[in-house]
Amino acid sequence: LPIRVAQFLHVVRGNPLKVARIHLGCVKCREIPKLLPHFHVSLQSGSESVLRRMGRRYTREKLCRLFRRIREMVPDAVLRTTVILGFPGETDQDFQQMLDFAEEIRFDHLGVFVYSDADDLASHRMRLHVPAGVAQDRYDQLMSAQMDIAAEKNQRRIGQTLQVLIEEDLGSSLFAGRTCFQAPEVDGVTYVSTASHAVPVAIGCFAQARINDAMEYDLIGEVA
């Protein structure tokens, strides 16, 4: 949609540090009024050693400083990242650093992927490939930690009234939609009930919903 008619804009791709800094400047200065304070910084790993093996040009410390700066300058910022577990050479210590990083930063949204090998990848020729079972166990541990973080953050939204883009009629006066901080396909949804209100709700339109319950990734509310 053109900026003049879009309700809000997400930035979801780009060089992690460069794009995030530009994005932060635009949000802080309100250069693009509809640009959301939602920062997708692709972390890849919270281990300095793994980042080097991946050939990344940024460090764990630079990422930490960036996230702290975002939170200081934009208190209501939403932080999103993606990481890869089981990259060749990743040790238990490397994974613990990643787990500690996630606990410290407390991302609003965290996408976790297990390394998938292929003959044409440069990493295919690296030593010390991580056994699939070990990588999966690390995935389970990190996702469990993130689930607790996400649940805590969602609990804080109970009592708030949020704008929700209605996307699906589930029947029985229940609709599913997304708030501005819930990206399509990858995040949770917000369920909106109209049972106790005669307020019309339409697919593709926005509705105000008061949040009265929360799950790990989804919110539950009623039209306000």
Regions found by a protein language model. Give the residues of each.
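Conserved non-cysteine loop/helix-boundary elements of the Radical SAM core domain that shape
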Residues: R13, R21-D108, Y115-V134
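Terminal RNA-binding accessory module
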Residues: R125-A224
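OB-fold and OB-like beta-barrel modules that bind single-stranded nucleic acids
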Residues: F39-V41, L110, V164, I211
